[in-house]
């Protein structure tokens, strides 16, 4: 058989471990994995000494289109992800205008992404007051799941879910067999603390971080878990930043609830000290935690208590990253390009096998959200993979692919670099630049088969 692509001599990072193997691609699928594949191919990639990881599945990005393309946009955002070894992403329903809270809005965004996205994509629908009747139509239109905020979202267009909206929405989402992703921070506690600091005239990094303490995350997580018991709704907790919240979620799993949890590289690689040094570029919600909190989070990740890692790429125009008032500064990290590299660094630093990195960044999100042909280097799966070279990579403005070159990661050096990224057998990134320009992404809709709890 003649193949389209053969990657030769690499170490393939697979579910059972890392093995030296060639990978043959035909018609966008992995056709064969094994040693010494000698058949002809249109393209032969010599990858001796390199690793091949499954293409990352980033279940949490904000590309802000339509309506706020000046913040990022689907074209620049998807090419940025490709430069980081990511071959599928789930775009969140907020920061765009209009918010993705109706089937009409969801399909309009999908049409834009089909024209602009370099890699495959899925779309979250939004759970927002006044829009619960749109949940089923969005599910039928292909929403990967639904997203709600338990505290203010940061944009006027996407309101946080009050208790009635949350409970009504959870019942409907459960009836549709979908998953609700939650930004879990207590609205009451964060608003109270923010007002207290405002009265004292405290608006700096320390005040902002103190206004969103561990207790705010843990209270919201526990309340959502109890609501899940009452409604039967499957939950996915996004960007969890503390060990205590992770342990609450694990207890819910032991109790039989259908819940999963993600964290983000910035909570694993950086700490509050970096927030003090970097300022607004490092502002996010929840905020970066203490060094001790970071080490505890790494510990529960290494123990297998966190299901997956996503970027929560949430950029903005640099003018919104205000240094004079941290409460008014945009809260979001521009970091989608660095998730896979960050997790490889973490694995090297802590002696964690690379197959765990593949699970966190690819297999687990694909499985959780019903993408049955994604997330693993297996015959018959989509030929989505990243070739990674063990050579240092320093983040500079010149090596960032996001629209705006402002990031917490600037100046950071990773031990490995992305040599190339393939989406369905097509090279969409090669070290130093885009390989094939154009929009090759397709709209991913979840399988009807409901996977078991991870």
Swiss-Prot record:
- Record-linked SUPFAM superfamilies: Composite domain of metallo-dependent hydrolases (SSF51338), Metallo-dependent hydrolases (SSF51556)
Residues recorded with modification N6-carboxylysine: 147
Pathway per its UniProt entry is: Nitrogen metabolism; (S)-allantoin degradation; allantoate from (S)-allantoin: step 1/1
User: How would you describe the post-translational modification of this protein?
Assistant: Carboxylation allows a single lysine to coordinate two zinc ions.
Catalytic activity, EC: 3.5.2.5
Q: Which reaction does it catalyse?
A: (S)-allantoin + H2O = allantoate + H(+)
Q: Which GO terms describe its biological process?
A: allantoin catabolic process; purine nucleobase catabolic process
Q: For Zn(2+) 2, which residues are the binding ones?
A: 147, 183, 239
Keywords in UniProt for this one? Answer: Hydrolase, Metal-binding, Purine metabolism, Zinc
Its required cofactor(s), as named, are:
Zn(2+)
Question: What's noted on cofactor binding?
Answer: Binds 2 Zn(2+) ions per subunit.
For this record, the Gene Ontology CC terms, alphabetical, are:
cytoplasm
Q: Which residues bind Zn(2+) 1?
A: 60, 62, 147, 312
The record's listing under Pfam families reads:
Amidohydro_1
* Coiled-coil spans in chain: none
Question: Known InterPro entries for this protein?
Answer: Allantoinase (IPR017593), Allantoinase_bact (IPR047604), Amidohydro-rel (IPR006680), DHOase/Allantoinase_Hydrolase (IPR050138), Metal-dep_hydrolase_composite (IPR011059), Metal_Hydrolase (IPR032466)
Q: Can you provide one Gene Ontology molecular function annotated for this UniProt record?
A: allantoinase activity
Q: Which family does it belong to?
A: Belongs to the metallo-dependent hydrolases superfamily. Allantoinase family.
Subunit structure comment from the entry = Homotetramer.
Q: Which HAMAP family match?
A: Hydantoinase (MF_01645)
Q: What's the stated role of this polypeptide?
A: Catalyzes the conversion of allantoin (5-ureidohydantoin) to allantoic acid by hydrolytic cleavage of the five-member hydantoin ring.
Under what name is this protein listed?
Allantoinase
Q: What organism is recorded for this protein?
A: Bacillus velezensis (strain DSM 23117 / BGSC 10A6 / LMG 26770 / FZB42)
